[in-house]
């Protein structure tokens, strides 16, 4: 389990004002153990699967940043439109903002501009700074602001945190490197209201049971009055969905195949070579989701000595690397209500491509 406890743990090479808590990093022994556990859980099943969190080493995070700028990939633009329009409503009253799966923190800047204006006066910094914060449920105009980005990629997160400290000199930044699906709390926060962000449509990467476990975990570590903002992709034309995950430039293909490199580099194995695979994105209408696969272009035999396991794939067989569920707003709101989150607002972009739902813990 990974606790959200910024300000403790490894702080090597931290920029001024940044303390990075490292719980899981791809090149660490802990990451090897975590990936081995994930492989044992899914790689030897039918079909073999690997959780999408293993996309995001430093290269994978940079590739995904490129994907968000592609013409075919509408979710980032649509979500950004909603964030720009609703930023004041989203951050109102919050003194701590926690982003799960923060990555480069690029999409969050529109909220940070409203939450802690660049160079704004009266913003506290450093652990324990309150600077006029009032009790939970509201804050004074000069209340300290704290941002806690959480991500699995230590390299990317550390770089992003350093940039944020320079761009928002009054903002306390406490990055946490760890698995966002295994947080045991308690959530960090100044006195005042906490806002948890889960953007980018990542909620769609979970199976039904995984989503239930994730929401139950969040409810367990959040307090009454805390708010949760979730980004979700809306159901639309299958052709448009497939194009968003199989772009003409091949960036998504490189992103997908990079996971093969991550596995080969992180765990001891032989016979695993990205040149033996190709990228595929397909629409699964029955599950209302896009599926990403790496398909073997020839017969492969992979040996994992430390696991005492092998896996053979015939040409044409694949490894499922991601699912991306598409939602109807009412279904997601009902799901959240069943886990103790009450709807406060649901927004979509002008084109009706993407949605944000803001809920509060009862």
Residue ranges and their predicted role:
Residues 2-53, 61:
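N-terminal auxiliary segments of SAM/dcSAM-dependent transferases
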Residues 47-89:
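Class I SAM-dependent methyltransferase Rossmann-like catalytic core
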Residues 94-103:
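Conserved class I S-adenosyl-L-methionine
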Residues 193-212:
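A short SAM/SAH-binding and catalytic strip from SAM-dependent methyltransferases
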Residues 212-224:
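A short glycine-rich, Lys/Arg-flanked "PGG" loop and its adjoining helix->strand segment in the class I
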Residues 240-325, 329, 333-339:
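Substrate-binding/catalytic lobe of Class I Rossmann-like enzymes that use SAM or dcSAM, i.e.
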């Amino acid at each position: 389990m990974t606790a959200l406890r910024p300000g403790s743990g490894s702080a090597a090479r931290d920029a001024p004002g940044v303390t990075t808590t490292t719980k899981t990093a791809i090149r660490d022994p802990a990451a090897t153990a975590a990936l081995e556990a994930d492989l044992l859980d899914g790689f030897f099943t039918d079909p073999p699967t690997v959780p999408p969190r293993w996309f995001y080493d430093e290269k994978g995070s940079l590739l995904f940043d490129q994907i968000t700028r592609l013409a075919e990939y509408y979710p980032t633009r649509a979500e950004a439109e909603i964030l720009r329009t609703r930023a004041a409503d989203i951050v109102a009253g919050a003194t701590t903002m926690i982003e799960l799966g923060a990555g480069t923190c690029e999409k969050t800047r529109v909220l940070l501009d409203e939450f802690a204006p660049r160079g704004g006066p009266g913003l506290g910094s450093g652990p324990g700074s309150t600077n006029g914060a009032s009790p939970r449920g509201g804050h004074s105009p000069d209340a300290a602001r704290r941002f806690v980005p959480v991500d699995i990629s230590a390299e990317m997160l550390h770089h992003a945190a350093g940039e944020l400290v320079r761009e928002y000199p009054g903002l306390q930044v406490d990055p946490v490197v760890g698995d966002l699906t295994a947080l045991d709390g308690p959530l960090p926060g100044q006195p005042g209201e906490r806002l948890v962000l889960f953007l980018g449509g990542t909620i769609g990467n979970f199976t039904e049971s995984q989503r239930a476990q994730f929401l139950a975990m969040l409810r367990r570590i959040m307090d009454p009055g805390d708010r949760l903002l979730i980004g979700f992709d809306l159901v639309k034309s299958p052709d448009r969905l497939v194009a968003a995950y199989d772009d003409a430039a091949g960036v998504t293909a490189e992103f997908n195949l990079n996971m093969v490199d991550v596995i080969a580099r992180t765990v001891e194995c032989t016979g695993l070579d990205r040149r033996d695979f190709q990228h595929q994105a397909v629409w699964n209408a029955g599950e209302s989701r896009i599926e990403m696969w790496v398909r073997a272009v020839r017969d492969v035999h992979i040996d994992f000595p430390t696991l005492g396991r092998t896996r053979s794939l015939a040409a044409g067989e694949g490894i499922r690397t991601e699912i991306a569920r598409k939602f109807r707003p009412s279904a997601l709101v009902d799901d959240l209500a069943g886990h103790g989150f009450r709807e406060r607002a649901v927004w979509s972009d002008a084109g009706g491509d993407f949605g944000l739902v803001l809920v509060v813990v009862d």
